[in-house]
């Protein structure tokens, strides 16, 4: 039957044999190892016999000795290390139960002293005490009764299921019978601390929930594991009718689980919450908040009336209460002006002589419909004093001067500007748009046009350096698709000092550089077209009021033409020296390093071209013939800044990297492909040095970033131009002069 020799010897009480077997290597609690150790041929242990032995009763030596009351054998086995808590795998019977069934008190005492558990139950739910009761072992019963905590149940109680079993069955009638017979079953808890009401709320049994509530079950009871209530369980499982009933019975919606969630929070965690359920819980939460606020207000009034002292401020914590206070304060404010200037895209400055209206004077709190407005604001000290003395200045109507000062400071700091703009704006000169075709301008006509237009200009306060940038974007876009590499090298009467640095914010962007308008050199002659653009840019600067506060203009000597201004005042944003002529100009652009070396003051002109260029076709031919000398000359507006209109060879010369030009020519890298090169591409081309690669990558990044800025500025400029074109001052052109 699977019993080992050791088990049989212990069953018969043969202690000498048991000791002999143990001394020769028999295992105390393992019948399978006992078979192997004994070498019994009848019960030879192989892989199959081991599995069969596990399926049998697994008769162990201690269990056999305890069942037959062999106290000496039990003591010997325990001394050799047998576990007193060992039990049969199939039935759950322990050695203590077998000893109690046999009625051996001494064996029971030995087992308990060695660690046997008197509360252990078998598969039938019986303890050793119940086994002794059933078999009427009086001595063992008396001994185990004092040490057993699991008390035996009567037979009728065993036959009747508990309330949780009835809830699992969904039998409302059985639940009713149980709670009527024993009222304590209403609030009984299971192992997780859950009550029958919670279980009914989970399953959605509305009838059982109503029955338990009628039997005075605790509606707000929380389980011991998660701290959930019956309302939370019903909400999370979507039992809407149960939620309505529990709310009607006064369930607390403010109770929080151990993770801090309320019933409303749990319903919001659902993927598809019921809209009606959400509204129901939200309305109840709002009513509870209102009731609590009313109770706090009544208690505060009672304390104020009894003590005669001002009540302490109420609890102002939480986002909801803060938002309520702020909304009440802003409801009493009256804004006499709106903050249009901070939200408008119009960059024009206000009228110069308009009175400054501080923001503090635009806000006045009103009490009972009375409006208080003042064109000017008192000093800071006087204003704070007035706020502390009058009720009209208080946002709450209670004279809380400190809070009024804080809210005023918040609005002042959050406003776009410190003062509000005026409604009056001067007419704006529209940005220069090149016509579809140029006429052969002459120097005399340019001078007369300049004199005629200068009489119609008006002084205007400069804005935030945006007037020049508006025209820059249009002129860039007009000349963006055509690239003319020809730039005149020698100084001329028209362009030697008429262009500003590319980083100047006043009017230099209006005529963005010689290379920005190189198409005008080819259409109408470089000298004449440059002079026209210079005059228009100078006219815009005089209209902006910049010519009044700068140094007087120095005219370039020209024996055959009308003198033009050599240098114009400009706003230096990045502390750069103006590039008036080639003798003083050095590349100080912060965008690229190293900068090109300074060029000589005067470069000898070609043999077929005079030193001082006239106008017309001669200037045009000279401008187109000077392609190779463009980047080395710093005259005009060239200041070392890389632009997207520069050719690849010019960019390399500006970077002093002419030695790499054959590499790009050999690989047939054009300007479009150049703008897409990466560090790996440059290494593949053969540029192994880190310094030149970083300079080339910086130039590519600057050109790509400039294209994005031009598109953004173009959109803003077109909008401003369309809005201001109707009100711009129209100046008639002077009569056309022929050669």
Curated annotation (Swiss-Prot):
<feature type="region of interest" description="Disordered">
    <location>
        <begin position="295"/>
        <end position="320"/>
    </location>
</feature>
<feature type="repeat" description="ANK 3">
    <location>
        <begin position="91"/>
        <end position="120"/>
    </location>
</feature>
<dbReference type="GO" id="GO:0005737">
    <property type="term" value="C:cytoplasm"/>
</dbReference>
<feature type="compositionally biased region" description="Pro residues">
    <location>
        <begin position="593"/>
        <end position="603"/>
    </location>
</feature>
<feature type="compositionally biased region" description="Low complexity">
    <location>
        <begin position="582"/>
        <end position="592"/>
    </location>
</feature>
<protein>
    <recommendedName>
        <fullName>Ankyrin repeat and SAM domain-containing protein 6</fullName>
    </recommendedName>
</protein>
<feature type="repeat" description="ANK 2">
    <location>
        <begin position="57"/>
        <end position="86"/>
    </location>
</feature>
<dbReference type="Pfam" id="PF00023">
    <property type="entry name" value="Ank"/>
</dbReference>
<keyword id="KW-0677">Repeat</keyword>
<feature type="repeat" description="ANK 1">
    <location>
        <begin position="1"/>
        <end position="30"/>
    </location>
</feature>
<dbReference type="Pfam" id="PF12796">
    <property type="entry name" value="Ank_2"/>
</dbReference>
<keyword id="KW-0969">Cilium</keyword>
<dbReference type="GO" id="GO:0048793">
    <property type="term" value="P:pronephros development"/>
</dbReference>
<feature type="region of interest" description="Disordered">
    <location>
        <begin position="449"/>
        <end position="645"/>
    </location>
</feature>
<keyword id="KW-0966">Cell projection</keyword>
<feature type="repeat" description="ANK 5">
    <location>
        <begin position="158"/>
        <end position="188"/>
    </location>
</feature>
<feature type="repeat" description="ANK 6">
    <location>
        <begin position="192"/>
        <end position="221"/>
    </location>
</feature>
<keyword id="KW-0217">Developmental protein</keyword>
<feature type="compositionally biased region" description="Polar residues">
    <location>
        <begin position="462"/>
        <end position="478"/>
    </location>
</feature>
<comment type="function">
    <text>Required for renal function.</text>
</comment>
<feature type="repeat" description="ANK 8">
    <location>
        <begin position="259"/>
        <end position="290"/>
    </location>
</feature>
<dbReference type="InterPro" id="IPR013761">
    <property type="entry name" value="SAM/pointed_sf"/>
</dbReference>
<dbReference type="InterPro" id="IPR036770">
    <property type="entry name" value="Ankyrin_rpt-contain_sf"/>
</dbReference>
<feature type="domain" description="SAM">
    <location>
        <begin position="643"/>
        <end position="706"/>
    </location>
</feature>
<feature type="compositionally biased region" description="Low complexity">
    <location>
        <begin position="490"/>
        <end position="506"/>
    </location>
</feature>
<dbReference type="InterPro" id="IPR002110">
    <property type="entry name" value="Ankyrin_rpt"/>
</dbReference>
<feature type="repeat" description="ANK 4">
    <location>
        <begin position="124"/>
        <end position="156"/>
    </location>
</feature>
<dbReference type="Pfam" id="PF00536">
    <property type="entry name" value="SAM_1"/>
</dbReference>
<dbReference type="GO" id="GO:0005929">
    <property type="term" value="C:cilium"/>
</dbReference>
<keyword id="KW-0040">ANK repeat</keyword>
<dbReference type="InterPro" id="IPR001660">
    <property type="entry name" value="SAM"/>
</dbReference>
<feature type="compositionally biased region" description="Low complexity">
    <location>
        <begin position="604"/>
        <end position="641"/>
    </location>
</feature>
<feature type="compositionally biased region" description="Basic residues">
    <location>
        <begin position="295"/>
        <end position="305"/>
    </location>
</feature>
<feature type="repeat" description="ANK 7">
    <location>
        <begin position="226"/>
        <end position="255"/>
    </location>
</feature>
């Amino acid at each position: 039957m699977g019993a080992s020799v050791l088990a049989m010897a212990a069953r018969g009480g043969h202690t000498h044999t048991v000791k002999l077997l143990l001394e020769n290597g028999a295992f105390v609690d393992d019948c399978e190892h006992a078979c192997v150790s004994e070498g019994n041929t009848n019960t030879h242990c192989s892989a199959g016999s081991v599995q069969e032995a596990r399926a049998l009763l697994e008769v162990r030596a201690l269990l056999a000795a305890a069942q037959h009351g062999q106290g000496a054998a039990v003591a010997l086995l325990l001394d050799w290390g047998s576990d007193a808590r060992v039990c049969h795998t199939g039935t759950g019977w322990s050695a203590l139960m077998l000893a109690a069934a046999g009625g051996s008190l001494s064996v029971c005492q030995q087992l308990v002293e060695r660690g046997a558990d008197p509360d252990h139950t078998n598969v039938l739910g019986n303890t050793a005490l119940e086994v002794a009761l059933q078999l009427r072992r009086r001595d063992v019963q008396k001994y185990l009764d004092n040490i057993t905590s699991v008390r035996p149940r009567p037979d009728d109680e065993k036959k009747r299921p508990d309330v949780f079993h009835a809830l699992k069955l969904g039998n409302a009638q059985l639940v009713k019978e149980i709670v009527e017979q024993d009222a304590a079953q209403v609030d009984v808890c299971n192992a997780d601390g859950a009550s029958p009401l919670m279980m009914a709320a989970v399953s959605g049994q509305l009838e059982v929930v109503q029955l338990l509530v009628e039997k005075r079950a605790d509606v707000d009871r929380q389980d011991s594991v998660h701290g959930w209530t019956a309302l939370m369980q019903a909400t999370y499982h979507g039992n809407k009718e149960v939620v309505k009933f529990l709310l009607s019975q006064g369930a607390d919606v403010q109770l929080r689980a151990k993770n801090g969630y309320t019933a409303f929070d749990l319903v919001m965690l659902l993927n598809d919450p019921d809209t009606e359920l959400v509204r129901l819980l939200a309305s109840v939460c709002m009513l509870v908040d209102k009731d609590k606020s009313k109770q706090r207000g009544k208690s505060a009034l009672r304390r104020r009336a009894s003590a005669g002292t001002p009540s302490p401020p109420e609890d102002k914590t939480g986002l909801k209460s803060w938002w309520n206070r702020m909304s009440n304060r802003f409801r009493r404010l009256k804004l006499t002006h709106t903050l249009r200037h901070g939200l408008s895209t119009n960059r024009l400055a206000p009228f110069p002589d308009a009175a400054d209206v501080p923001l503090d004077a635009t806000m006045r709190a009103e009490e009972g419909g009375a409006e208080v407005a003042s064109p000017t604001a008192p000093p800071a000290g006087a204003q704070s004093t007035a706020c502390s003395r009058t009720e009209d200045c208080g946002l709450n109507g209670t004279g809380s001067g400190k809070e009024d000062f804080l809210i005023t400071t918040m609005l002042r700091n959050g406003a776009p500007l410190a003062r509000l703009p005026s409604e009056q704006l001067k007419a704006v000169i529209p940005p220069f748009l090149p016509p579809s075709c140029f006429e052969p301008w002459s120097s005399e006509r340019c001078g007369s046009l300049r004199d005629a237009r200068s009489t119609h200009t008006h002084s205007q306060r400069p804005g935030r350096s945006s007037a020049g940038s508006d025209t820059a974007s249009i002129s860039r876009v007009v000349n963006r698709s055509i690239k003319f590499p020809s730039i005149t090298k020698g100084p001329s009467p028209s362009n030697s000092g008429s262009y500003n640095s590319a980083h100047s914010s006043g009017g230099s962007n209006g005529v963005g550089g010689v290379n920005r308008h190189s198409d005008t050199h080819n259409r109408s002659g470089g000298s004449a077209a440059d002079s026209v653009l210079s005059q228009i840019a100078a006219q815009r600067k005089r209209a902006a009021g910049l010519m009044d506060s700068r140094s007087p203009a120095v005219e370039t000597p020209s024996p055959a033409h009308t003198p033009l201004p050599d240098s114009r005042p400009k706003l230096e944003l990045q502390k750069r020296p103006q590039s008036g002529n080639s003798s003083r100009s050095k590349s100080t652009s912060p965008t690229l390093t190293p900068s090109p070396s300074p060029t000589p003051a005067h470069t000898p002109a070609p043999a077929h071209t005079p030193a001082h260029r006239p106008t017309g076709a001669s200037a045009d031919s000279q401008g187109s013939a000077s392609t190779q000398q463009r980047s080395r000359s710093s005259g005009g507006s060239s200041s070392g800044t890389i632009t997207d209109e520069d050719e690849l060879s010019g960019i390399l010369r500006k970077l002093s990297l002419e030695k790499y030009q054959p590499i790009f020519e050999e690989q047939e890298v054009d300007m479009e492909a150049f703008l897409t090169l990466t560090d790996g591409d440059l290494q593949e081309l053969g540029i192994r040095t880190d310094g030149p690669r970083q300079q080339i990558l910086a130039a590519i990044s600057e050109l790509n970033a400039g294209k994005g800025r031009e598109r953004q500025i173009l959109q803003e400029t077109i909008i401003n131009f369309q809005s201001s074109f109707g009100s711009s001052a129209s100046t008639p052109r002077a009569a056309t002069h022929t050669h």
